UniProtKB/Swiss-Prot annotation:
Keyword Nucleotide-binding listed: no
Subcellular location: Cell inner membrane
Membrane among keywords: yes
Predominant location: membrane
Transmembrane segments: 1-21, 39-59, 87-107, 113-133, 143-163, 187-207, 218-238, 244-264
GO CC terms of this entry: plasma membrane
Taxonomic source organism: Alteromonas mediterranea (strain DSM 17117 / CIP 110805 / LMG 28347 / Deep ecotype)
Membership in a protein family: Belongs to the UppP family.
Pfam families listed in its UniProt record: BacA (PF02673)
Miscellaneous information on this protein: Bacitracin is thought to be involved in the inhibition of peptidoglycan synthesis by sequestering undecaprenyl diphosphate, thereby reducing the pool of lipid carrier available.
The protein's name in its UniProt record: Undecaprenyl-diphosphatase
Amino acid sequence: MTLFEIIILAIIQGVTEFLPISSSGHLLLPAELLGWVSQGLAFDVAVHVGSLLAVMIYFRQEIGQMTVAWVTQGFSKQQSTDSKLAWYVIVGTIPAVIIGFLMKGWIEENARTALVIAGTTIIFGLLLWYADATAKREQELEGLTLKQAIYIGLAQVLALIPGTSRSGITMTAGLMLGLKREACARFSFLLSIPVILGAGLLATLDLLSANEAVDWYALLYGAAFSFVSAYLCIYLFLSWIARIGMLPFVIYRLALGAVLLWFVFA
């Protein structure tokens, strides 16, 4: 890969990991438009590391408080808000882990097509618009319940379908349950930590078994640009989402889906 390709792909990973706009669709475009080949397992690991570091550093205070609270109070009857939130992240992650483990091979073989990605980009974009337009959006993250965390975790399973957008579907579920936009985004980003970590570990295991040649400079640049773009994305999204709402992202998803459909049927 050239340095230009590394930078573009790393930025795509960093931004689309957290915005509700589907990473699958964006990673498909360079291949369709420019004929870029697959970036390889090592690069995939590197950009996941960059995204993971970004979200963990941004939420370092919350993660520290949740970890301490969970270790000291996790199995007691009296639990603080931080301890409960830690449990909710764990509970919300379990459905995607189980279904992902069972269905990963089938999904990769049958669902990772341009037509599927285009369809899910449009359909779940419209669902995001409906949730944002009709939901009450009154509840803070501190008021999240176990039942709500389970529902959001079950919704996250749909993100295994390429084009859905993990952040998009979890925010959609949160909005439908009455959470404020920023609360939906914060819980979605916290849920991303074990998901990105798991995806990175799986890619690492695949890399070790593949015995693939490693370009360390490409990995360093990939991780760095993924980190910077992801961190800025998280910061700006949380700063603006309460004011701008989800409509700009919905419009963008519809446009992206239309472009992908054009590639399919052209």
